Amino acid sequence: AAVLPEKNILFAFALSAGHREPDRVVSIDLKKITIGQLRGAVSNAELIGEIFGGTKYKVVYEPNMEDYLLCHAAFVMPAAFACYKTDGDLKKLRRNTVYLGRVIDANIEGYRAIRNAGHDILPKADADFESEKYRKTCLRFFKLMCATSLGKLCASDHAMNAIDEMSALNRDIKRFFDENGAAYPVWQALEAEAGRYLR
């Protein structure tokens, strides 16, 4: 925003996923979008309301998209490591509670680094990320992802078809961790187990 002060810049994250097959597109669209600007910018809540007014989308206005996207990376990358470990077949992990616990540990390491660097944990529902309740909620979520086609649609399809993007995201978030003196040993171990996929 500081680079382009005359521009009104918004960032958005839509909850949708899918993949292309030879004769069709398989997708899921949860009709939910998180959208907003960087912290400190002029509010766009009214404009966003006008844009999405009359649509079936549930719109979550987020005035701090930088922290939201940092947290998203800290949640998504450990899940991507699981996708790479299994060559995209998350069902191989559906009963591996120990590994899924490590995925959660890596997410917590990421959130801790983000919080300790002075950023907010977003969404706010994740703010108590070191609690047993958070761990149980995440474990249920990851077990569901590994046991159903949701894992393929919402995680492994994207991870397996966006290796360059995931590799860049991993490099960038690790640079952030390093610049802020964060320890992330579980993250690094899962990354190593992801093998040949990450570049």
Residue map of PLM features:
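Long, contiguous hydrophobic alpha-helical segments, chiefly transmembrane helices and signal peptides
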Residues: 13-18, 74-78, 82-84, 166, ...
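Glycine-rich beta-alpha junction loops
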Residues: 13-18, 39, 65-67, 79, ...
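Internal alpha-helical scaffold of NAD(P)-dependent oxidoreductase catalytic cores
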Residues: 3-8, 27-122
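NAD(P)-dependent Rossmann-like dehydrogenase/reductase catalytic/cofactor-binding core
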Residues: 108-111, 115-199
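Rossmann-like NAD(P)(H) cofactor-binding subdomain of soluble oxidoreductases
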Residues: 1-26
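Short amphipathic alpha-helical segments, especially helix-boundary/capping motifs
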Residues: 22-27, 55, 83-88, 146-152, ...
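Short, solvent-exposed polar/charged micro-motifs at secondary-structure junctions
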Residues: 19-23, 69-74, 133-135, 197-199
